[in-house]
Structures are given as C-alpha cells and as structure tokens.
C-alpha cells in the first residue's frame, strides 16, 4: 500500500491505525514509526476500569442509574503542595499532542477538571470547569498550568461558568501542539469557552477528575493523529530536582 504498512489493533477500547514513516538520519534514510492515529471511547457500560489509572482507586467507582453507567468520584482529596490538583484518573499508556478529548461531566460541588498534556504530578495543564466566573473566583473556571510550582491561570477569567448547574454538560478540549492552541468547549455556548496559545507541554496523558470536590463523568472520547508524540520537547520543562520531587510526591500522597 504505497510503501506503508497499515494494521488495525484494538485494546481497552482503543483503535489505532499505525503507519510506517521515513526519517532522514545523517546521509541515509532510516525507517521509524510515524505518529499513530488513535480513537478511544469509554461509556463505562462494561463495568470495568482497566483503561484508567487512579491515584486512589478506592475513591472511584462505576454507578448505574436507570440503565446508564458512569464513573463516579466517591471522595475528594486535599490538593498537593505546591497547590495543584491530584485527584484525577489518567488514561493508561496513552500520550498525545494533537487531540480532541470529549466527555460528559456532572458536578456535585462547584467544579470538576479535565487534565491534558500530563507529564508528571508537577507538569500538566487542566481545564477548571466551574459554576463560578473567574472574576468572582480567581482560581476557578479557566485553563490552568502546573509547571513545577503552584497552578497558574493562563486564560478564562471573563468566561461564563462552564458548569452552571448540576446537570450533565458536554465538554470538549481541542489541542494542537504545533500551533500551541488550546480550545475548551462547553455546551453552554456555541464557540470555545476558553482559548489560549501555549506551547509549554507539547505532549502527555489525559485525565478527568476534580480539584477538591466530587462528581461524575461519562462517554469519554479521545481522537488523536499523533498518539505517542514523537520527539516531544519535554526538555523545555522547568523541573525541580528529582530528590525534592520524590519527597513532595510522597508527602502529598499521604491520606
């Protein structure tokens, strides 16, 4: 097929279409895997959570109501120090830079979050989806970055609440790591509710959870054209030293 080997592979609800690409190395051509196309979906109807990794598995469960199954957060946890969210489920073994991530969200408190471009517990973005405007609550309702220190807002101060009530809402995160664009959509309006250009983290995992409250998720769908993120420039990340990071993680993981 024009020199490209194409195969179909399914695991944990994922379907990927990898192709073989060519890269110029020195004076010769060397074959290397091209970024893989990825489609993942989880409606939790199977009753299994094999596709997800949790900081505290006992805090999460699948609930059935009226024949519909969804992921429920039973318990919130204290944020980490430096102050940032820790209570979110990550999609196992999947990293992407260019992607569309969609999910249905329902809050029990005032807010929930969607995490993306997750590198480690001190380096990631998250969309904070709140009942509040950022003008009323400076750390609510917007896109935030955790970059080795306390979370910081990068956009969304004037946006309307992403989750104005305790009903289900459809949320979508669109990310293009090449252009740096991040757009977050909520069904409360037609266009993006939050938009920003930021290239700090070009690749990482995706997750769903809350800063310090509880709620529900359903119908998670991820579509990406660069699963695996070849050559992510993670060297640009400003990291704290490894010993300090391990001490901080050990401290923040205590009940």
Where are the regions a protein language model picked out?
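Carbohydrate-binding surfaces in secreted/extracellular proteins
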Residues: 44, 103, 167-195
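Extracellular carbohydrate-recognition regions
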Residues: 32-56, 227-231
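Secretory/extracellular carbohydrate-interaction modules
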Residues: 78-146
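Flexible glycan-contacting loops in extracellular carbohydrate-active proteins
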Residues: 193-219
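Short, low-complexity, charge-dense intrinsically disordered segments
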Residues: 3-4, 8-11, 233-255
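Extracellular glycan-recognition surfaces and repeat-rich motifs
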Residues: 48-77
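Extracellular beta-strand elements of beta-rich domains used
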Residues: 44, 220-222
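Short, aromatic/His-centered strand-loop micro-motif at the edge of beta-sheets
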Residues: 148-170
